[in-house]
């Protein structure tokens, strides 16, 4: 069942990491915004400093699986990059926290999901709203050349976290902006006070309510990934502003990743 290898592991904080994994058969084809299930057996060591897991595994050989959005571009064929927050009482992430480079693990053979840009017309701007590791699919999108192939398209990223140390990928986003990408970035921190203008204080939904980000259903497609409370509030706000939820049967301009 273990069919992939951890090839890189970066700990951003004590409970936030970037993991790169290489499936034995190579990186499968996928679209930015999709996710993959990975897992480790219950017998794998778990971080000892964390509280006991909420559900003890009864079969130590059974693979504990969870799904994670992919942060790497589909153009990257060496490995898949995952942005992972440790859940202290969880079953998988405390085991991933113990894993070292070279560790074997399970990776689903297929990458799936409908939270992609496939149905977005090229003349539409993108507003990408996330909290925590919900940023991952948007990093994949902005790393992918085809996202930028549409003249006049502008992309806005709002990323909400508790502490500024949790603003993963901030430096990469700023480098893209400095290089001339038509990209706006609004980092939002809820539990620290900003120094100068390094971030905004509060919650991402506040900066959609107050007009910091101008939204027009005729011009913009909004994508949301992260905390369900944020998603519900933003969805309600945008439905009142004549946005419509996208589905396979009914195309719209409001795209929601329900997994959390």
Where are these regions (language model features)?
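Short, surface-exposed secondary-structure boundary micro-motifs
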Residues: 41, 110-111
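A short, basic/flexible loop-to-alpha-helix module at the beginning of a structural domain
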Residues: 111-121
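Histidine-anchored nucleotide/phosphate-binding helix
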Residues: 137-148
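Reductase modules of NAD(P)H-dependent flavoproteins
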Residues: 156-260
